[in-house]
Amino acid sequence: MKIMITISENSEAKELMPIAQAVHILVNKLPVAMRSKNKPGVRLEKGEVVDTNYEGYVLKVAIEKGEVVRATPIIGPYAGLPVIVAPIKDGDNVLGAIGVVDITAGIFEDIVAISRRPELYKFLPEDAFPK
């Protein structure tokens, strides 16, 4: 049996759920939110779906800009918590966005900058080690 998951600018929460759940598990059940460009999406916390009509201001910003956004929202369920949101693209067309609460608060970037281990160079993009 072949099953295909597709995402479009008009995907609804139920269509986004399998991908959002997979990412939620990959990040050890950190809060994850995902939406399409034109419709509200889904929000997961502690292994559970907590919202299937989630707008997400920072998700909308990432969709509008078409680039990764690192921000600390001032309103909403994640107010005061740093988040990282990435657009979901098909070429230059932004279909939606997915984000996670950044419990490291940027510590990972600091650790990479401090360590600058040469053996990591072959696994990471050049911009991971700014000059």
Swiss-Prot record:
Keyword annotations of the record: Cell membrane, Membrane, Transmembrane, Transmembrane helix
Superkingdom, taxonomy of origin: Archaea
Methyltransferase among keywords: no
Main location per the UniProt record: membrane
Membrane-related topology note: Multi-pass membrane protein
Transmembrane segments: 68-88, 94-114
Location of this chain's protein in the cell: Cell membrane
GO cellular component: plasma membrane
Cysteine pairings via disulfide bonds: none
Matches recorded under Pfam families: DUF2111
Membrane recorded as keyword: yes
Name recorded for this polypeptide: Uncharacterized protein MJ0405
Record organism: Methanocaldococcus jannaschii (strain ATCC 43067 / DSM 2661 / JAL-1 / JCM 10045 / NBRC 100440)
